[in-house]
Amino acid sequence: YETADRPEPPVNPAAYGAAGALCGPPRALQAFAAAAMAGKLIGPPMRAEMRKGDPALAHAGLGVWSYEAPLDGCVGPTALVERRGAIGAVEVRLVMAPAIERSLVLFSNRADVPLGEVWAGEGLTHALASAAFCKI
């Protein structure tokens, strides 16, 4: 939704190419995350290179953001790998915790509901990541 009472017009994410960044049904993204964490997509050396999040570049790695975040309920910071996509008011977040082989797929079509930043310890994504990765 662009606003609480006005829906976003229909879009075809494929028409946006790389601008869409991430699209697909939730189960497909969950399957992708499981395969990525299990090493079925790329080998250990390339996976390690991809996950080298550079703090000088907002923790950007190769096609992902990779960082440690303070999550509620976890002992110490948790290593996370994140991929995002957005077109208009539609947002997608894929957050992976490789050390425990768990992931979170989040879709939102509400511009009035801020997803926040996990690394900053704020917002809906942080709350859901804390529940998914720490309160198990």
What are these model-predicted stretches?
Residues 3-136:
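Catalytic loop of the DD-peptidase/beta-lactamase superfamily, centered on the K-T-G motif
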